[in-house]
Amino acid sequence: MWGGCIQFRISVPGAKIICFKGHHMSRMSIRGQGQVTGKRSCHLHPLLRCAKGLLLCRPAAGLRHLQNQQNEPSQDPHQCADSCPALHSDRNHLNKEAEAMEGQNPTCSRHESAYPIQSQVSKSKKQRNYVDGAAVDDLKNLWDRLQTLQQSLTEMPYAEGLKPLKNFTSFEELLSMGGDSLLNDLLDIQDSITQCCIRASKYLNKEGNCTSLNYYKQPFIAAVYGPTGCGKSQLLRNLMSAQLIVPTPETVFFITPQVDMIPPQEIAAWETQICEGNFLAGPENTVVPQSGSIMPRFIQMSYAQLTKDENYDVTSPNNIFANAASKGPIAIVMDECMEDLGGNRGIAKFFHAFPSKLLDRFPKCTGYSVIVVLHNMNPRRDQGGNIANLKIQAKVHMISPKVHPSQLNRFINIYTKGQPTAISLLLKDIFNYHRLNTNFDWIVYNTEPIDNCMHWMYLSPQEGLIPMYLNIQGKLYQALERIHRTLTDRQRWTRYYHSKKK
């Protein structure tokens, strides 16, 4: 079905399906309640395929410490008994804490002396650690991810400048030759990864996909970067129909250089998709609107109308945005306006000052979204500073892998300074892989994610919106460095031993 992109089998009537046809995404609502099973054909980067299974990780277990202890000495018969039976053996006394009568099994004083008569059990200085079954499973889970990461780092084209990391040849060799210190450190890293997955799972659905881009954070300012033909206009409609922006806007303002630039079929597509994004399937064959409006409004505007003085003043009765905000959430979408944005007229107020005034003045306006489409990540013409302000104020950057690699590399170098160099190179390899192997896919960078796993996300027609877990990849790389350091130290001490032996 739909060109072999997605094949669905509906087992019971009553489900909602979000599907893509090529680069087009639409939703089908089926009456009743039931399940949908799907078969997808996707071409994900190997590391992204591995990220889909991160939520299946188990809590990390520690090492079980068993010491070389002597046998417990037999109890001295002259010592007091552990428990002394009271006079009321059936415990029917009103005061359960009543002491026994004098001479009837007197209680013993439990105060420990500073100098006990019996010497403490001697302990061996060296302790042996035994890994229990749960810890072995956690280490095996970590080992599989380390193998995937190391293979991806080795095979990517950017690996020439990376230092090769030593590793054990097999998992069995790691268990037998790793040592207690290394295994403990690896289990700590696995436990940290597990905690990250648990925190992130609260914001994901059962398939491990993100349910929203902003998770009700306001205002929502987004920049979309991509060359002509990469599906930017379709992406904008899909964000509305897939309900990735919450709350759902009741009024969508579509800004273009001229109003007559929009063909009738595109207007119909906008009206259809923002309408279907406003409803969810309800009980008993009903649909439930997600906003206070049954039919969201779609208003076309030119860039000249946007920059009118009356639209900057929230108190003006002619402010079209204020009038719409008094009824509910609004969204402003700017498409094909990069040349106008580079002019002298500044519109930076729409990115920071205007939304705060609008949200404070109108309680019904619970959502304010601005999405700006740019063909170039670094345009030369920006006389009014609009594009520079947009990049600063934007909370979400949606980047097509089709963008020129030099611009992508510059963006990645700026926004991954806290990550290891290997992870930054890996992100560049992910962009390059999807530039060559996929179409209409997007990489999303969130400056203020609800969870650190969602700083970088991947938006695919087949897979939806999935987190890339770059923070977890950084922890995995830390584990690889820990193994490398252990093996390097052993080799150095081995050389030192042989040199002294001669």
Swiss-Prot record:
One of its GO terms (cellular component) is host cell nucleoplasm. Residues 99-122 are annotated as: Disordered. It comes from the Viruses. GO terms for biological process: DNA-templated transcription; nuclear capsid assembly; regulation of DNA-templated transcription; viral DNA genome packaging via site-specific sequence recognition; viral release from host cell; viral transcription. One of its GO terms (molecular function) is DNA binding. Its main location: virion. ATP binds at residues 226-233. The keyword Nucleotide-binding applies. Coiled coil: none annotated. It is found in: Virion; Host nucleus, Host nucleoplasm; Host nucleus, Host nucleolus. Keywords: Activator, ATP-binding, DNA-binding, Host nucleus, Nucleotide-binding, Phosphoprotein, Transcription, Transcription regulation, Viral genome packaging, Viral release from host cell, Virion. The keyword ATP-binding applies. Induction: Expressed in the intermediate phase of the viral replicative cycle. Residues 495-502 are annotated as: DNA-binding. HAMAP family: ADV_PKG1 (MF_04057). Component of the packaging machinery which encapsidates the viral DNA into preformed capsids and transcriptional activator of the viral major late promoter (MLP). Binds, along with packaging proteins 2 and 3, to the specific packaging sequence on the left end of viral genomic DNA and displays ATPase activity thereby providing the power stroke of the packaging machinery. The activity of packaging protein IVa2 is stimulated by protein 33K which acts as a terminase. May be the protein that pumps DNA into the capsid powered by ATP hydrolysis. Homodimer. Part of a genome packaging complex composed of packaging proteins 1, 2 and 3; this complex specifically binds to the packaging sequence on the left end of viral genomic DNA and performs packaging of the viral genome. Interacts with protein 33K. Belongs to the adenoviridae packaging protein 1 family. This is Packaging protein 1. It comes from Canine adenovirus serotype 1 (strain RI261) (CAdV-1). The gene is IVa2.
